[in-house]
């Protein structure tokens, strides 16, 4: 309680003094602030931010977008202090960005100036009419887009000629003004807008006709109502306004066509012609002599739209006349386009086609019109085109991605009549493979693409004209994927060596290309003495220099596509360091800001003190209530036992605080009988002991395992496990002898403990005496051999008493993690309960202070997996420094069988003790120079063997070694250990050079394991006599798996046959 009060007072002082120590502590200032930018949509953008402080590593950076903290994903992420946005979107990323630099020591925050991000895009353009009369024509180019800080470029075109400010034409930004327009200004007006995002033309232009503007008149005439004959006298001086209907067309008042002007002959009613042949449409006309000087136009229309026209009478300098009965023509009413195939003959009005194409089919009509008069129309004629049989477009070869759900290859044929499309494989009249079909449109559909779909496919199109075919090649490829992507941002010291991994899989085999800051790297443009491009794609840089710092990108690609990942390399130079500085505040507002800061700080500190005092009172009340309950329970128990228990625990109250994992079992040992009296009220201190149900003598057992921390020496870290670091070191010989003596005492204590607990204990504690009897009866499958081995061990132990013992030390760092503590106790109980040659020995437990140390037996050759890799030539030496540097020869089949047999014996001992291992693999076994293999439990899941573990349901699991029921239901039994043992034998015959199912990702392994579709096969070098029993180890049904005794018998028989 006193410590808590002192801690609260210190915290209050720190909070109170925080506003006055900003200048001399770890305050920060920006040396690089983010700048406002305009980015083209779908491009990437980087906002740079850098602050300095003392020390320089005391900063944490955050980014705000429009006042809200950014949630990072694959598109928006932070690289160091900088913010990177991939594929900018105008709907999500536009706005204000602020960089926040926060000191981790003082909590002070500094915000950078706001940087604005604007997106440049360009969607569409259209021409709008703002005004049109006899004096001027005003058009506007309306653009859907944005150009940021740059101006939008607008270009105007009349027909196909580009316009500029000249004579009566003025261009002002988006507007076009034509002053005093004449017939020479007639035409189709379009605009083109362009910026950094691209260039777009208006989809619809504006057609201006000067003659129509002059002759247009309103058809709205003033008239009286039906029941009104006279105007009221009061209306004599009124002004009446006549308006046309809003949105309607204003038509010109046209006179009937003059006599004598007529069409003599129009096009035929039905004309049928083959595609590619010439065609002629007739239109004979007569013009009287008195009308020769009038302006008369001959027009051809297709499907109601103007196609061609020509002036027959007096010609104007320029213009299109007055087509379409006085209505203005826009893009929808005209088909005027440059086409050399179409020729309109002025002499006889004939429209001729050089070669007919399919799009020429339609309804044609000839029209004759005199200026200011109604048009004369011929009867329509239908042009029908017999289209040639052809592919539109031609089918092309294609690469299909393996395992794609659906892939399509199109084959579209056109012709008259409509052709029928068929597909064949490797020639004509051959059937298509499975999961390949053809739809009604002639599209070839592949479902669940696999390697059997490779080949040549022929598309055959037939109709009455004949048949045509096209052959395409279908290749099944695997898109490139990163098997080992580049590392996350790395920091490396100058003149050291860095390895940036980049490995890829795919079919065809992907090529790997490195670049630095978007500049390609190769052996020609790099220092070959420092840069090495390994065969698997990894980039190695030796003797790192300051100029090597940057962004390294790895691009993988094959015919199926490209993928790219980046890694940021930061080089720490010897001169790197932070200089102290003092932040100067303005003198004008300094006093007010300081006063406000002090008031806020004192208010927060006062509220915090009130909260702490309240918690202290509540904790004191809880502790007194708990003591009262414990005293009440102690009175009900035997008096002598109560006094002894209190003396063992209350005498050292700090021990339980320092030992959160094992101290609970001590208290349970004192109050062990309270669990059987049926009292529903149980204290918080016994919660963990209720789950473990250890005996009340467990404290005495742990005391027998106690080892002084000073007995350990030469500790070298070899990795990190799930609950702490793992070391290799040496244990004094005297402590090893004491541990061997304590083993005998612990066996007696176990029997005594079981007799006291009776039948009310758990399965693990009640069977210890039975286990010892079985161990002494020597009735298991390896009893006879163990008798001989024990004699050899006694001789070896006498020789080793004079030298220190090589040990493995597992540290429990996560003392507050209940799950880690539970697993620590499980491994401790497992190794403490077993005494077998195939299992590593438990020498003791160091629990004087945090972290706890679990001291286990270790061997001179280290873990089995590294030994297998060394014999396969994959590594140079074994794990430990004491191992020999002489290359090891490859293992023979007899040696592999011997290793598997020893592991089976050790696992059979675990089974007979009614324990499960849960992580059996070659990495968790050790081997000595005497070729003795023992089952151990390093479990280096955090670094060395992190690839062999996967986080599933908030736990790191070796999913490639686990049975399906372990992944689905978290159910571990001896049968699940047998499943893992089958994988271990697979590793042994493969020399541990491969991962099980290395062609599948971890997620795919989990999915197939849960579906029961994960297929296992034995290694190629496995003896025939073992294949059947090893395959049964991987049975989905646990009851169909063999026992370890059966596996040991099969291995023993195979060893005899191999000899």
Curated annotation (Swiss-Prot):
Residues 639-695, 739-781 are annotated as: Disordered. Disulfide bonds join 49-99, 141-191, 283-366, 411-459, 502-554. Residues 665-693 have a biased composition (Polar residues). Its main location: membrane. The keyword Glycoprotein applies. Residues 619-1059 are cytoplasmic. It comes from the Eukaryota. Keywords: Cell adhesion, Cell membrane, Disulfide bond, Glycoprotein, Immunoglobulin domain, Membrane, Neurogenesis, Phosphoprotein, Receptor, Repeat, Signal, Transmembrane, Transmembrane helix. Residues 28-112, 113-202, 258-377, 380-475, 480-570 form the Ig-like C2-type domain. The chain crosses the membrane at residues 598-618. It is a single-pass type I membrane protein. One of its GO terms (cellular component) is receptor complex. It is found in: Cell membrane. GO terms for molecular function: ATP binding; cell adhesion molecule binding; protein heterodimerization activity; protein homodimerization activity; protein kinase activity; signaling receptor activity; transmembrane receptor protein tyrosine kinase activity; Wnt-protein binding. Pfam families: I-set, Ig_3, PK_Tyr_Ser-Thr. Residues 712-1055 form the Protein kinase domain. InterPro entries: Ig-like_dom, Ig-like_dom_sf, Ig-like_fold, Ig_I-set, Ig_sub, Ig_sub2, Kinase-like_dom_sf, Prot_kinase_dom. Residues 24-597 are extracellular. GO terms for biological process: cell adhesion; cell surface receptor protein tyrosine kinase signaling pathway; imaginal disc-derived female genitalia morphogenesis; imaginal disc-derived male genitalia morphogenesis; internal genitalia morphogenesis; negative regulation of canonical Wnt signaling pathway; photoreceptor cell axon guidance; positive regulation of neuron projection development. Glycans are attached at residues 42, 348, 429, 441, 456, 469, 524, 536. The modification Phosphoserine is found at residue 698. Residues 742-753 have a biased composition (Basic and acidic residues). Interacts with plexA; component of a receptor complex that mediates the repulsive signaling in response to Semaphorin ligands. Acts as a calcium-dependent, homophilic cell adhesion molecule that regulates neural recognition during the development of the nervous system. Component of the repulsive Plexin signaling response to regulate motor axon guidance at the embryonic stage. Also component of a receptor complex that is required in the adult visual system to innervate the lamina layer; specific targeting of R1-R6 axons. Belongs to the protein kinase superfamily. Tyr protein kinase family. Insulin receptor subfamily. This is Tyrosine-protein kinase-like otk. It comes from Drosophila willistoni. The lineage of its organism: Eukaryota, Metazoa, Ecdysozoa, Arthropoda, Hexapoda. The gene is otk.
């Amino acid at each position: 309680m006193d410590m808590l009060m002192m801690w609260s007072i210190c915290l209050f002082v720190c909070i109170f003094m925080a506003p006055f120590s900003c200048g001399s502590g770890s305050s920060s200032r920006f040396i690089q602030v983010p700048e406002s930018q305009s980015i083209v949509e779908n491009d990437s953008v980087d906002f740079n931010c850098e602050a300095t402080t003392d020390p320089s590593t005391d900063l944490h950076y955050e980014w705000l977008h429009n006042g809200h903290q950014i949630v990072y994903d694959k598109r928006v992420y932070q690289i160091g202090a900088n913010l990177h946005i991939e594929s900018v979107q105008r709907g999500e990323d536009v706005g204000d960005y602020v960089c926040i630099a926060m000191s981790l020591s003082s909590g002070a925050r500094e915000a950078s100036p706001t940087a604005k991000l604007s997106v440049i895009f360009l969607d569409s353009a259209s021409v709008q009419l703002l005004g049109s009369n006899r004096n001027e024509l005003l058009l506007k180019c309306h653009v859907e887009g944005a150009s940021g800080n740059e101006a939008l470029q607008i270009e105007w075109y009349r027909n196909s000629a580009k316009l500029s400010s000249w004579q009566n034409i003025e261009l002002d930004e988006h507007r076009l003004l034509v002053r005093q327009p004449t017939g020479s200004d007639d035409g189709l007006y379009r605009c083109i807008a362009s910026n950094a995002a691209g260039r777009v033309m208006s989809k619809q232009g504006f057609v201006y006709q000067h003659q129509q503007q002059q002759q247009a008149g309103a058809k709205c005439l003033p008239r009286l109502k039906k029941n009104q004959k006279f105007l009221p006298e009061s209306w004599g001086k009124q002004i009446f306004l006549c308006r046309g209907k809003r949105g309607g067309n204003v038509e010109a008042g046209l006179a009937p066509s003059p006599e004598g002007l007529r069409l003599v002959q129009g096009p035929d009613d039905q004309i049928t012609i083959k595609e590619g042949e010439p065609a002629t449409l007739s239109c004979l006309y007569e013009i009287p002599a008195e009308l020769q000087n009038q302006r008369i136009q001959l027009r051809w229309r297709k499907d109601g739209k103007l196609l061609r026209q020509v002036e027959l009478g007096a010609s104007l300098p320029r213009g299109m006349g007055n087509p379409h009965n006085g209505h203005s023509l826009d893009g929808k009413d005209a088909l005027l386009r440059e086409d050399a195939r179409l020729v309109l003959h002025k002499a006889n009005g004939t429209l001729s086609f050089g070669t007919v194409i399919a799009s020429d089919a339609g309804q044609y009509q000839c029209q004759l019109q005199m200026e200011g008069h109604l048009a004369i129309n011929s009867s329509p004629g239908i042009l029908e085109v017999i289209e040639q049989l052809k592919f539109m477009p031609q089918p092309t070869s294609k690469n299909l991605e393996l395992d794609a759900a659906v892939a399509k290859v199109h084959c579209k044929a056109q012709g008259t009549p409509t052709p029928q499309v068929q597909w064949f494989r490797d020639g004509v009249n051959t059937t298509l493979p499975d999961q390949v079909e053809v739809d009604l449109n002639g599209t070839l559909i592949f479902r669940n693409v696999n390697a059997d779909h490779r080949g040549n496919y022929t598309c055959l199109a037939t109709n009455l004209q004949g048949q045509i075919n096209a052959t395409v090649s279908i290749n099944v490829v695997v898109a490139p994927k990163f098997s080992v992507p580049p590392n996350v941002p790395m920091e490396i010291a100058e003149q050291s060596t860095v390895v940036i991994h980049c490995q890829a899989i795919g079919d065809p085999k992907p090529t790997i290309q490195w670049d630095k800051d978007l500049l390609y790297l190769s052996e020609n443009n790099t220092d070959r003495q420092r840069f090495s491009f390994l065969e698997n794609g990894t980039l190695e840089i030796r003797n790192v220099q300051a100029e090597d710092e940057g962004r390294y990108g790895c691009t993988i690609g094959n015919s199926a596509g490209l993928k790219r990942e980046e890694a940021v390399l930061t080089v720490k130079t010897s001169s790197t360091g932070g200089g102290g500085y003092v932040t100067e505040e303005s003198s004008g507002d300094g006093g007010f800001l300081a006063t406000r800061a002090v008031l806020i700080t004192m208010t927060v500190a006062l509220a915090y003190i009130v909260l702490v005092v309240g918690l202290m009172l509540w904790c004191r009340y809880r502790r007194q209530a708990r003591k009262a309950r414990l005293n009440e329970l102690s009175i009900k128990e035997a008096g002598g036992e109560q006094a002894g228990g209190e003396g063992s625990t209350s005498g050292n109250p700090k021990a339980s605080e320092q030992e959160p994992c094992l101290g609970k079992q001590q208290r349970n040992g004192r109050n062990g009988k309270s669990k059987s009296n049926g009292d529903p009220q149980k204290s918080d201190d016994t919660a963990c002991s209720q789950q473990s149900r250890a005996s009340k003598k467990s404290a005495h057992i742990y005391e027998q395992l106690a080892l002084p921390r000073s007995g350990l020496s030469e500790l070298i870290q070899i990795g990190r496990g799930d609950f702490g670091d793992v070391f290799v070191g040496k244990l004094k010989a005297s402590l090893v002898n004491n541990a061997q003596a304590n083993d005998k005492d612990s066996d007696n204590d176990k029997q005594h403990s079981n007799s006291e607990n009776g039948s009310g204990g758990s399965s693990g504690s009640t069977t210890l005496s039975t286990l010892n009897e079985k161990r002494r009866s020597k009735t298991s499958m390896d009893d006879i051999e163990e008798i001989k081995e024990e004699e050899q061990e006694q001789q070896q132990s006498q020789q080793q008493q004079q030298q220190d013992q090589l040990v493995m030390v597992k540290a429990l760092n996560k003392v507050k993690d209940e799950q880690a503590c539970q697993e620590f106790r499980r491994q401790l109980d497992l190794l403490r309960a077993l005494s077998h040659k195939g299992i590593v020995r438990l020498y003791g437990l160091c629990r004087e202070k945090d972290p706890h140390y679990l001291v286990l037996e270790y061997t001179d050759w280290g873990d089995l997996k590294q030994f297998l890799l060394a014999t396969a030539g994959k590594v140079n030496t074994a794990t430990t420094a004491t191992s020999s540097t002489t290359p090891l020869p490859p293992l023979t089949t007899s040696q592999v069988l011997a290793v598997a047999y020893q592991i089976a014996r050790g696992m059979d001992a675990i089974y007979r003790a009614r324990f499960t291992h849960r992580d059996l693999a070659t990495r968790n076994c050790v081997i000595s120079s005497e070729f003795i293999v023992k089952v151990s439990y390093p479990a280096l899941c955090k670094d060395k063997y992190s690839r062999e573990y996967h986080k599933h349901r908030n736990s790191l699991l070796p999913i490639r070694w686990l049975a399906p029921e372990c992944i689905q239901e978290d159910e571990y039994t001896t049968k699940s250990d047998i499943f893992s043992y089958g994988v271990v034998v697979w590793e042994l015959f493969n020399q541990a050079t491969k991962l099980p199912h290395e062609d599948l990702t971890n997620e795919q392994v989990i999915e197939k394991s849960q579906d029961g579709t994960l297929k296992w096969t034995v290694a190629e070098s496995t003896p025939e006599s073992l294949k059947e029993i090893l395959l049964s180890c991987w049975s989905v049904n646990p009851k169909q798996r063999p026992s370890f005794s059966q596996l040991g018998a099969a291995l023993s028989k195979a060893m005899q046959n191999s000899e």
